Amino acid sequence: MESIYDFVVQKNNGESYKLEQYKGDVMLIVNTASECGFTPQFEGLQKLYDEYKDQRFIILGFPCNQFGGQEPGSGEEAAQNCKINYGVTFPIHEKVDVKGDNQHPLFHFLTNAAKGMINEKIKWNFTKFLIDREGNVIKRFSPQKKPEQIKTEIEKLL
């Protein structure tokens, strides 16, 4: 069976790397958009990151333009927007598709690994996947779930 650590992702500068560099970390993987009603969640996500990063907690943002065309720019533009408007310092990657024919393999894995949670395709921006230190998908959160509402779930894994 494949592991989350086998996946290769692209930074917003086009450089590729394997997720195995986060082995032993608690990860929160989020599909993001700069022009979405949920975009203010970047502020809450950054607060979570600031609070827990010293305990080996990482947030990985993956911009996506599949929902309402709310991420029209490049991954680099998305990252700049996040930094300028919300002070985001966690990694924002290159744009990906999170569903459909061109679905990024990581999001295929996440969606399937979340069986029994919400085993269905991602329906909107800011769907969040919580991964434990061993690489298991522990929980999937809907876009409506605000970052501060998932603190307890994160703390259980730290």
Swiss-Prot record:
| Annotated GO biological process | cellular response to oxidative stress
A GO term for molecular function: peroxidase activity
Q: What is its EC number?
A: 1.-.-.-
Q: Which residues form a coiled coil?
A: none
Annotated InterPro entries: Glutathione_peroxidase, GPX_CS, Thioredoxin-like_sf
So where's the catalytic machinery, residue-wise? 36
Keyword annotations: Oxidoreductase, Peroxidase
The enzyme's first-digit EC class, named in words, is oxidoreductase
Q: Do you know which Pfam families this protein is assigned to?
A: GSHPx
Q: Which PANTHER family match?
A: GLUTATHIONE PEROXIDASE
Q: Spell out the family assignment given in the record's similarity comment.
A: Belongs to the glutathione peroxidase family.
What is this protein's record name?
Glutathione peroxidase homolog BsaA
**What is the species of this protein?**
Staphylococcus epidermidis (strain ATCC 12228 / FDA PCI 1200)
**In the UniProt record, what gene is named as encoding this protein?**
bsaA
